[in-house]
């Protein structure tokens, strides 16, 4: 069943890419494993998932330990990260999807033993309930990260508003792509910013149409 559900999602990715003449290889599927146990996450890995995401530090560390026999897994931390937990996690992950303040970046820089690929979280929709910097703050924030030499800004991340129309979701994701292009055009060495992390289970088709390169999906067990 897991393999069937995974194949269904991969087919949906291919179909969405075909609509806008994109190569499916440009899109990385990240499985959100926060709602499954380690044994089920292992089934996903055995079915071909190589990117796993958690939104809690303790759960990611637990699953990484349980899946020690699969060093090829790329681990993604999504969601808000408290500064006091930075030291516990930053050297255990491959990607961080929610960089949104200089204080957090400085703490990450302080604790890192190796380079970490980070996405800057941008609150494109302007919802007060969402984390992330405002679009107006983006360029100054990117420039301020130059001193954090172990942080590599690989791209931008955003989430669509809840209960939004397809038109609204297209606008949010399209705006993030425009912001990504703006940063990329600056040619910052510390911020190549070639990636877009946007789209979850309910809206990743729209995200792909708007240029997403990383999508987060719950894969039903």
What spans do the regions from the language model cover?
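Conserved alpha/beta-domain cores
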Residues: 1-202, 208-210
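Divalent-metal-activated hydrolytic enzyme cores
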Residues: 213-215
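Conserved small/polar residues in nucleotide/adenosyl-binding loops
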Residues: 219-221
